[in-house]
Amino acid sequence: METENIHSFDVSLFSSCRVLVVGDMMIDEYLWGEVSRISPEAPVQVVEVKKTTSTLGGAGNVVNNLTALGAKVSVAGVMGGGKAGDLLNGKLTALGVNTEGLLVDQGRATTRKTRVIGANQQMLRIDRESKQEISEEQVQAIVRFAQNQIPQCDLVIASDYGKGVLTRSLMEELAKICKTAGKALIVDPKGMDYSKYKGATCITPNKKEASQASGVEIKDQASLERAAAKLLEIAGAEKILITLGKDGMALFSPGEEPFRVHAQARQVFDVSGAGDTVISVLGLSLAAGASYKTAAALANTAAGIVVAKVGTATVDQAELKAQLQDQPIAYQAKLKPLQELKSALENLRRQGKKIILTNGCFDLLHEGHINLLEQSRKLGDVLVVAVDDDESVRMVKGQGRPIIRERERVKIISAMTGVDFVTVFSTNQLDELIRAVKPDILTKGGNYKPDQVLGHEIVEELGGRIVLIPDASDVSSTRIIQDIRNGRG
């Protein structure tokens, strides 16, 4: 059996799931800049930094994925003190995560990976970290927290990035507590010795990790099965899910036939963090009552969504639901009512994303509209397009407008790959819209002046700014309509 019928699965069940994540919490930092010269000191490029952003990394990215899917999350681990530790704790707290199990060790570095981006390329990565195993005293403190939390949770995820938190003794204790409480322990492994994960319910290595840890070069189905069998024996796990990149993933259980799920991504832009999405959706699906085969198929579907996004990304319930129902994600998941949009943007803002807002009628989409949207998208990380409802278009443009009704206009805008979210608003809701979106930048066409843009005072009050996009041509919807009425094609 290669596929599982997952189309009827209710992803809203994820919202009632409680998860404990134990592992190596990190900060992923990005320095975005421009390169225009070579240093006079050495033959290296000079990056003029324009923007700095940061987000949760490592086990923290698992937390990002879980919260984006609506789960309630607690974390346990060890971090350093200072600014990096405060930043890590602050980002977790902002997501509504219970951080009581996150210990502070002033003598330990909080893992921070700084990527320098210039000319749209990663030029350098700087790592600040400690790989030293945590002390037995710290292990016992985490165990006490876990003993209190696990009976209240539906699932435990151990995310190992090899930074010293998931010691052998801690893994042994977690396995015992989970077994006693009857809760699943899902492990994203690291390193060559999987015997430290003995007692795990399921382990989720990728192809390279599975090959290295098993000592079996995976080059076909037979070698894949040998590697899986060896790792199941070493780890004593009930299941192993091996992710295979473009070849999907494979689920193995002792004494059962392998279950293969083929990759679903239509296009792949970035595989960063896809493994964190897999373990998150796999775990939540199991917690929500799915079988392992269904959970694996759901995880595969979610992975297909995130790899089509640029950068380390997450998937939310709306996107996953739309994909499961074979509906265009562009329309079903991008269109959000204002309050739902506000919540989605708050999560992205906490991840350091720069939010761009543009608004308009978009009645008879033309070259000027396309240019506005394309140029707006280049200014940040997330583009929100607010579309005037039919009554607002009528008020602004007069009787006989809109030519294209609201529902169709929304579908057309949503179909553009550079657009992340679409919302519908009325003219008298503009202030409410801006306060909900809190854009870093509000864009309008070049036929305006900044102080003529409606809502500019609120944008500036909230710390944003207005950017005018020069018109690419003199075409307009009004002119097109007039030409048609005058019989000119």
Swiss-Prot record:
Region spans: Cytidylyltransferase: 357-489
Region annotated Ribokinase, chain positions: 1-328
Family: In the N-terminal section; belongs to the carbohydrate kinase PfkB family. In the C-terminal section; belongs to the cytidylyltransferase family.
GO MF annotations in UniProt: ATP binding; heptose 7-phosphate kinase activity; heptose-1-phosphate adenylyltransferase activity; phosphotransferase activity, alcohol group as acceptor
Catalytic activity: D-glycero-beta-D-manno-heptose 7-phosphate + ATP = D-glycero-beta-D-manno-heptose 1,7-bisphosphate + ADP + H(+); D-glycero-beta-D-manno-heptose 1-phosphate + ATP + H(+) = ADP-D-glycero-beta-D-manno-heptose + diphosphate
GO biological process: ADP-L-glycero-beta-D-manno-heptose biosynthetic process
Name of the protein this chain belongs to: Bifunctional protein HldE
Cellular-component GO terms for this entry: cytosol
Transmembrane segments: none
Organism of origin: Desulfatibacillum aliphaticivorans
Keywords from the UniProt entry: ATP-binding, Carbohydrate metabolism, Kinase, Multifunctional enzyme, Nucleotide-binding, Nucleotidyltransferase, Transferase
Pathway in which the depicted protein is active: Nucleotide-sugar biosynthesis; ADP-L-glycero-beta-D-manno-heptose biosynthesis; ADP-L-glycero-beta-D-manno-heptose from D-glycero-beta-D-manno-heptose 7-phosphate: step 1/4; Nucleotide-sugar biosynthesis; ADP-L-glycero-beta-D-manno-heptose biosynthesis; ADP-L-glycero-beta-D-manno-heptose from D-glycero-beta-D-manno-heptose 7-phosphate: step 3/4
Record function comment: Catalyzes the ADP transfer from ATP to D-glycero-beta-D-manno-heptose 1-phosphate, yielding ADP-D-glycero-beta-D-manno-heptose.
Active site per UniProt: 276
EC number: 2.7.1.167, 2.7.7.70
Keyword ATP-binding: yes
Subunit annotation: Homodimer.
InterPro entries registered for this protein in UniProt: Bifunc_HldE, Cyt_trans-like, PfkB_dom, RfaE_dom_I, Ribokinase-like, Rossmann-like_a/b/a_fold
Binding positions (ATP): 206-209
